[in-house]
């Protein structure tokens, strides 16, 4: 296997799509903390470090889950499953990236490095190893891994975590269950076959659709409170986006199918991305 092919395999294992959203959360956290006269340079080591650590965590996750990934159609083509990267190699390379990413966080401050490391620890040890194979609460508690990215971004400029910074991380925590349950509903049979107790594999489609709607509804007050802290423009934009999210959640309850679930999943991605982009834009204008 050539070096180019090996790098391509690791980039696939690193889940750049997921990591890019975590990066956006981190940058949004930094801009949320931004005040006139504060240097934006600390964003650079935080961004690079967070990216490397997040990719490292994803690679370790793929190394740990090879056996179950083999029986899931969604993951059966991963480089770890087809043999391009073995378990030991994935864990070693992922660990090195996570350590390097955390080390870069120290360029800013100890708190930023702590939150970068915290995201890795929660994703690997709490979510992947402890909770995912054992309880439907796996993604609920595991959502704090995404929160850590936002907190790393916020603390990179402030070396402290205030209420508004906490709210951004808590927003991501609240967003995570409904988002991933929508995906799990689409691939319910995969999780059943792999013996993962993801909520849709445990309670069925109809109850899962209701749980997704409830989870999204519980998130919205946090979104609106954050919008209130930012400014009126953000609050109005967040309200409009949240109304459409709940419309899709309502449609999923009325028609709990895989097709509606994937629509909910796709828009929840767009929803969070737009929330984070709006936060950045209103700080720039």
Swiss-Prot record:
GO molecular function per UniProt: protoheme IX farnesyltransferase activity
Pathway: Porphyrin-containing compound metabolism; heme O biosynthesis; heme O from protoheme: step 1/1
UniProt keyword annotations, A-Z: Cell membrane, Heme biosynthesis, Membrane, Transferase, Transmembrane, Transmembrane helix
InterPro entries per the UniProt record, alphabetical: Protohaem_IX_farnesylTrfase, UbiA_prenyltransferase, UbiA_sf
EC code(s) of this entry: 2.5.1.141
Membrane topology: Multi-pass membrane protein
Major location (coarse): membrane
Top class in the EC scheme: transferase
Reported function: Converts heme B (protoheme IX) to heme O by substitution of the vinyl group on carbon 2 of heme B porphyrin ring with a hydroxyethyl farnesyl side group.
Family: Belongs to the UbiA prenyltransferase family. Protoheme IX farnesyltransferase subfamily.
Other observations noted: Carbon 2 of the heme B porphyrin ring is defined according to the Fischer nomenclature.
Full protein name: Protoheme IX farnesyltransferase
Species in which this protein is naturally found: Saccharolobus islandicus (strain L.S.2.15 / Lassen #1)
Gene field: ctaB
């Amino acid at each position: 296997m050539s070096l180019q092919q090996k790098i391509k395999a690791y980039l696939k294992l690193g889940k750049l799509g997921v990591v890019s959203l975590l990066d956006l959360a981190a940058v949004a956290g930094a801009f949320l903390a931004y005040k006139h006269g504060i240097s934006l340079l600390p964003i650079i080591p935080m961004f690079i470090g967070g990216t490397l650590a997040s990719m490292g965590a994803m690679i370790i996750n793929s190394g740990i889950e090879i056996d179950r990934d083999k029986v899931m159609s969604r993951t059966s083509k991963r480089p770890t499953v087809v043999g391009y990267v073995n378990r030991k190699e994935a864990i070693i390379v992922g660990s090195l990236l996570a350590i390097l990413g955390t080390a870069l966080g120290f360029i800013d401050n100890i708190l930023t490095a702590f939150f970068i490391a915290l995201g890795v620890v929660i994703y690997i040890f709490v979510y992947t190893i402890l909770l995912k194979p054992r309880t439907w609460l796996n993604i609920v508690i595991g959502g704090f891994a995404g929160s850590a990215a936002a907190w790393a971004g916020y603390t990179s400029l402030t070396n402290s975590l205030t209420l508004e910074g906490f709210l951004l991380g808590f927003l991501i925590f609240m967003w995570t269950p409904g988002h991933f349950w929508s995906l799990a509903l689409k691939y319910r049979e995969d999780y059943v076959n792999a013996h993962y107790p993801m909520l849709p594999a445990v309670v069925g489609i109809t109850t899962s659709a209701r749980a997704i709607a409830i989870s999204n509804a519980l998130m919205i007050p946090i979104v609106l409170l954050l919008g209130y802290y930012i400014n009126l423009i953000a609050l109005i934009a967040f309200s409009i986006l949240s109304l459409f999210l709940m419309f899709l959640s309502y449609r999923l309850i009325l028609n709990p199918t895989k097709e509606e679930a994937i629509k909910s999943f796709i828009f929840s991605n767009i929803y969070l991305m737009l929330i984070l982009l709006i936060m950045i834009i209103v700080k720039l204008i």
